[in-house]
């Protein structure tokens, strides 16, 4: 059964590496960091099925910047339920006034802002965050995240504000239409009326999709039933065939500020 699963996984996720270890299907994906701020998402579980520790998910490596404080080292900024951010920085092990003290065990580890300790933070599959790379624009580098392929049939985000960070919780691309289900969502004639999925591109812009009400043309004079309730790329009047990429994050813009966004596992589907 596991061999069948890994074969299916490899076929679906051609851009991600996989192997079979013990009873687990494990893999990895890489993301290129080429700018200061990049939206990323965790696509794996720990090998025992639990959430991945932040230290194991993003160990210090080439291209990453350590620092004395949150304003000097690379950051991982995770949005909280109230719309704020929980911020971790990559420590150089120094602390105290002017970095007068040093803790070798802290050097190259992620620390919660305001603390001088190795953070004990778990990142569940689908956790989406900003990665702030101090040298990203001048010295691009690659982050590799490895772990176990999730076996849950779906993962759901709760929407309680206008803008929520979302990301694919699986190491395979998920069809935006058919692979993502929403409740409490608003359809509209244009991108300014319907709910949005805004996926960050490599150049720092966004591919923006809106939930269509099926209408198009001047003043919504035409109607396509097959488009009603489907995601459409901004500027188009067709149900998109695009997929949500692995390892990248996106903004979900909710007009009602309530509802859910559910990603369906393409491996177990």
Description of each model-found segment:
Residues 1-21:
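Sec-dependent, cleavable N-terminal signal peptides
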Residues 4-5, 112, 199, 233:
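Residue-level detector of intrinsically disordered terminal segments
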Residues 17-72, 82, 120-193, 242-269:
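A short, polar beta-strand/turn micro-motif
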Residues 26, 35, 58, 83-87, ...:
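Intrinsically disordered, low-complexity segments enriched in small/polar residues
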Residues 68, 73, 79-81, 88-93, ...:
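Tandem-repeat architecture and repeat-register "anchor" residues
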Residues 87-147, 211-267:
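Charged, amphipathic alpha-helical scaffolding segments
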Residues 169-232:
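Intrinsically disordered, low-complexity segments enriched in Gly and acidic/Ser/Thr residues
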């Amino acid at each position: 059964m596991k061999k069948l699963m890994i074969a299916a996984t490899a076929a679906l996720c051609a851009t991600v590496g996989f192997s079979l270890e013990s009873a687990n299907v494990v893999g990895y994906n890489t993301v290129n960091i080429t700018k200061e701020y990049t939206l990323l998402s965790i696509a794996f579980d720990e090998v025992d099925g639990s959430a991945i520790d932040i230290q194991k998910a993003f160990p210090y490596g080439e291209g990453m910047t350590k620092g004395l404080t949150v304003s000097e080292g690379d950051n991982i900024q995770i949005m909280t339920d109230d719309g704020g951010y929980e911020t971790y920085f990559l420590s150089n092990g120094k602390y105290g006034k002017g970095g007068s003290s040093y803790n070798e065990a802290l050097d190259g580890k992620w620390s919660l802002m305001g603390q001088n300790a190795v953070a004990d933070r778990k990142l569940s599959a689908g956790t989406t965050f900003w990665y702030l790379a101090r040298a990203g624009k001048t010295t691009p580098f690659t982050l590799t995240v490895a772990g176990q392929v999730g076996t849950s049939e779906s993962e759901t985000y709760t929407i309680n504000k206008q803008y929520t960070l979302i990301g694919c919780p699986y190491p395979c691309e998920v069809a935006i239409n058919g692979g993502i289900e929403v409740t409490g969502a608003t359809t509209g004639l244009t991108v300014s009326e319907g709910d949005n999925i805004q996926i960050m591109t490599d150049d720092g812009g966004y591919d923006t999709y809106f939930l269509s009400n099926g209408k198009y043309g001047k003043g919504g004079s035409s109607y396509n039933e097959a488009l009603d309730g489907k995601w459409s790329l901004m500027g188009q009047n067709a149900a998109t065939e695009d997929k949500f990429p692995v390892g990248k994050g996106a903004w979900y813009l909710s007009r009602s500020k309530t509802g859910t966004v559910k990603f369906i596992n393409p491996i177990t589907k």
